[in-house]
Amino acid sequence: MLAAAIASFASNLPGWLLAFGMWFLIWTPLVALLEYATHRWIMHMANRLLDPRLDQLKAHVTHHRGSNDDEFVNMPLKNCLLLSSPFLLLLLGGGLLAGSPTSVIIPAAAFLTWSFVYTYLWTVIHRAIHGVEQNWFRRIGPAFRFFRNHHLRHHVHAHGNYGTVFPLTDYVFFTWLGGDVRPRRIVMRRRSKTKRARA
């Protein structure tokens, strides 16, 4: 019986992997929307429904003031799972109502995998952008510069450029901040030199 189950698993593996990959791609817009919504409406607004103690807002304000400690730059897996869990529960509940919870195992696994991948990408990209560590993302040249410039514009003008891993969401929601904007600390440093020169 075990041998038959293993043989069945092995023969169906290519189909399962194809379905997993398809669902991984299908979930991409939802993950991008979750990133955008979280950054815009939880990290930049007092939202006691989704963040009762305003921990995310306070931590993000500290980060925007220049703190690049791990707790302000990294994406905790716990936070990502808290955001994705309602969708996983809806998916599993839908499978139970349809009568076949196994029909949602692959879509749920793909969405859960996206949660892990997203947490990793956010942390790597964000750490590279803020110079916290030299990692593979800093070495990809033009793509790194694009992501860095997009994100640093957000630090100068916090009313746009909310997409860190998915910056194109800012085009979709009309919050793209273009143009040549210097990071705040450089602008502040130059102002202080000008003030000293005048004194």
Where are these regions (language model features)?
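Helix-coil boundary and interhelical linker segments in multi-pass alpha-helical membrane proteins
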Residues: 2-23, 93-109
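N-terminal membrane-targeting hydrophobic helices
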Residues: 10-13, 26-27, 33, 88
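Loop-to-helix transition at the N-terminal end of transmembrane alpha-helices
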Residues: 18-28, 46-54
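A membrane-cytosol interface segment of integral membrane proteins
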Residues: 191-199
